[in-house]
Amino acid sequence: MRSDDVKAGYARAPNRSLIRSLGIDESEMHQPFIGIANSWNTIVPGHTHLRVLGERVREGITAGGGTPFEFNTIGICDGIAMGHEGMRYSLPSRENIADSVELMIQAHKFDGIVCICTCDKIVPGMLMAAGRCNIPAIVLTGGNMLPGNLHGCELSLTDVFEGVGKVAGGTMTEEELTELETAAMPGCGSCQGLYTANTMACMTEALGMSLPGCAATPAVYADKIRLAYRTGKRIVDLVRKQILPRDIITPASLRNAIRVDMALGGSTNTVLHLMAIATEAGVPFDLQEFNRLSEQIPHIASMMPAGPHSMQALHHAGGIPAVFRQIRSHLENCQTVSGMDIYTIADSVKYVDESVIRPEQSPVHQSGGLMILTGSLAPDGAVIKSGAVQDEMWKHTGPARVFDGEELAMKAILAREIKEGDIIVIRYEGPKGGPGMPEMLSPTSALVGLGYSRVALITDGRFSGGTRGPCIGHVAPEAAAGGPIAFVKDGDQISIDLFTKTVNLNISADEIENRKKGWKPLKRPLTGVLARYAAAVGPADLGAVLQ
């Protein structure tokens, strides 16, 4: 066992003495040492219940014949961090979490690890650590929040963000907004729709790194507590059989994750995170794989925010196993941490609510819900949630309205300075330029709330999974790296064509070269973690991992 490095032989008597001080019994000393990386805290709604799940995981590990040791990592709520300086710290926290879990695994020589996590950057951060350390691992995702309800209508956090735009537009009062914000979020769990946290939970299950049914089970259901116990028992089996993350996270399982992502129409952030997970697991992966698979996989579930269905509805419709069944012919048969392969899980499904998870013969859209765009504005790629774009905006040309940062753009939007047909460009919000690649949910939600229907938004920053509409993010190279987006001027014509997967700046290459003369990138004063992050982070098209 790996843990023998800290507990076997007379030379390790001091180490054992410290372990015995924890109350560890002699019999426990000879069992596999299993780490539990929890991310419980009392500020993130998706994480407030994780202490209970951690207790149940410990019980499962003990029942399975292992010795559990629990520790904590940080966790940031993107929704609370949204719209202010705090958003710049969210993506860097992913690397902090991956590093923290690695540090604990390697310092204490755990034989296996259970990762308990729910929200946007915590799930990929822990998956990155699992792939990097490559000891037996299972991820337990914490589950989704139940939908809110007001006057008989189901609600999610996006309704509140869009309510801000409605107040600015005069179609909602501040009192009505207060009533909405109070009703929208009824308890613990990840935000209710197929936003980034829930999409990453689905990706985790599709990769094979969590037990079947885990992704869509709501946070407050007893099933989630049972899944925690089973996860604890199962990790001990994985240790004994030495089934490792790199046996599970393979080119084929990553392709399966993308297929499920396309079928559901998940968050654009999955592109960034799956690339990072692949890098940490040592799997070569190309950004264009997303487009290739998108053309093969129909979009079969109309999930919030683009559609009506919550994650609770997805759970009752059969969850990710039901998605496997509906697109089984497209999936590759990979092993999972459960001991069952993907086909076995798909074939074990007894019921699918096809009003939620449609058969591929009658999809929401014929192709997948995400798309990689390239062109003169994004030579190294950009991402759009095509499944959330209205038909009339699949091909659009309009004048650029350029803003060096989200705050300036938000002021212009709320002041109604944007016209229908405009293409808003928000730059210097990339991995280095932001730094931290903040999400642009506030401006996109304000546009919806104000009633705009023909305004596109392009950025080298990111979008929340709650974003809908013609919003193109992750533009690479970013402005801070001298990408073409740095040289766009107000009034330049930009063409977006989702049919050809292109986004082009309609000026000549010579004009771009002229604009480069004397160019100096916007520099924000940085200290601490953001300064270190900006100096070390790589480009978005490679997952924005530290170099």
Swiss-Prot record:
<feature type="modified residue" description="N6-carboxylysine">
    <location>
        <position position="121"/>
    </location>
</feature>
<feature type="binding site">
    <location>
        <position position="191"/>
    </location>
    <ligand>
        <name>[2Fe-2S] cluster</name>
    </ligand>
</feature>
<comment type="similarity">
    <text>Belongs to the IlvD/Edd family.</text>
</comment>
<keyword id="KW-0001">2Fe-2S</keyword>
<feature type="active site" description="Proton acceptor">
    <location>
        <position position="464"/>
    </location>
</feature>
<comment type="pathway">
    <text>Amino-acid biosynthesis; L-valine biosynthesis; L-valine from pyruvate: step 3/4.</text>
</comment>
<comment type="subunit">
    <text>Homodimer.</text>
</comment>
<keyword id="KW-0479">Metal-binding</keyword>
<feature type="binding site">
    <location>
        <position position="439"/>
    </location>
    <ligand>
        <name>Mg(2+)</name>
    </ligand>
</feature>
<comment type="pathway">
    <text>Amino-acid biosynthesis; L-isoleucine biosynthesis; L-isoleucine from 2-oxobutanoate: step 3/4.</text>
</comment>
<dbReference type="InterPro" id="IPR037237">
    <property type="entry name" value="IlvD/EDD_N"/>
</dbReference>
<keyword id="KW-0460">Magnesium</keyword>
<feature type="binding site" description="via carbamate group">
    <location>
        <position position="121"/>
    </location>
    <ligand>
        <name>Mg(2+)</name>
    </ligand>
</feature>
<dbReference type="GO" id="GO:0004160">
    <property type="term" value="F:dihydroxy-acid dehydratase activity"/>
</dbReference>
<dbReference type="GO" id="GO:0009097">
    <property type="term" value="P:isoleucine biosynthetic process"/>
</dbReference>
<feature type="binding site">
    <location>
        <position position="119"/>
    </location>
    <ligand>
        <name>[2Fe-2S] cluster</name>
    </ligand>
</feature>
<keyword id="KW-0456">Lyase</keyword>
<dbReference type="InterPro" id="IPR020558">
    <property type="entry name" value="DiOHA_6PGluconate_deHydtase_CS"/>
</dbReference>
<dbReference type="Pfam" id="PF00920">
    <property type="entry name" value="ILVD_EDD_N"/>
</dbReference>
<dbReference type="InterPro" id="IPR042096">
    <property type="entry name" value="Dihydro-acid_dehy_C"/>
</dbReference>
<protein>
    <recommendedName>
        <fullName>Dihydroxy-acid dehydratase</fullName>
        <ecNumber>4.2.1.9</ecNumber>
    </recommendedName>
</protein>
<dbReference type="GO" id="GO:0051537">
    <property type="term" value="F:2 iron, 2 sulfur cluster binding"/>
</dbReference>
<keyword id="KW-0411">Iron-sulfur</keyword>
<dbReference type="InterPro" id="IPR004404">
    <property type="entry name" value="DihydroxyA_deHydtase"/>
</dbReference>
<keyword id="KW-0028">Amino-acid biosynthesis</keyword>
<dbReference type="Pfam" id="PF24877">
    <property type="entry name" value="ILV_EDD_C"/>
</dbReference>
<dbReference type="GO" id="GO:0009099">
    <property type="term" value="P:L-valine biosynthetic process"/>
</dbReference>
<feature type="binding site">
    <location>
        <position position="78"/>
    </location>
    <ligand>
        <name>Mg(2+)</name>
    </ligand>
</feature>
<dbReference type="GO" id="GO:0005829">
    <property type="term" value="C:cytosol"/>
</dbReference>
<keyword id="KW-0100">Branched-chain amino acid biosynthesis</keyword>
<feature type="binding site">
    <location>
        <position position="120"/>
    </location>
    <ligand>
        <name>Mg(2+)</name>
    </ligand>
</feature>
<dbReference type="InterPro" id="IPR056740">
    <property type="entry name" value="ILV_EDD_C"/>
</dbReference>
<keyword id="KW-0408">Iron</keyword>
<dbReference type="GO" id="GO:0000287">
    <property type="term" value="F:magnesium ion binding"/>
</dbReference>
<dbReference type="InterPro" id="IPR000581">
    <property type="entry name" value="ILV_EDD_N"/>
</dbReference>
<comment type="function">
    <text>Functions in the biosynthesis of branched-chain amino acids. Catalyzes the dehydration of (2R,3R)-2,3-dihydroxy-3-methylpentanoate (2,3-dihydroxy-3-methylvalerate) into 2-oxo-3-methylpentanoate (2-oxo-3-methylvalerate) and of (2R)-2,3-dihydroxy-3-methylbutanoate (2,3-dihydroxyisovalerate) into 2-oxo-3-methylbutanoate (2-oxoisovalerate), the penultimate precursor to L-isoleucine and L-valine, respectively.</text>
</comment>
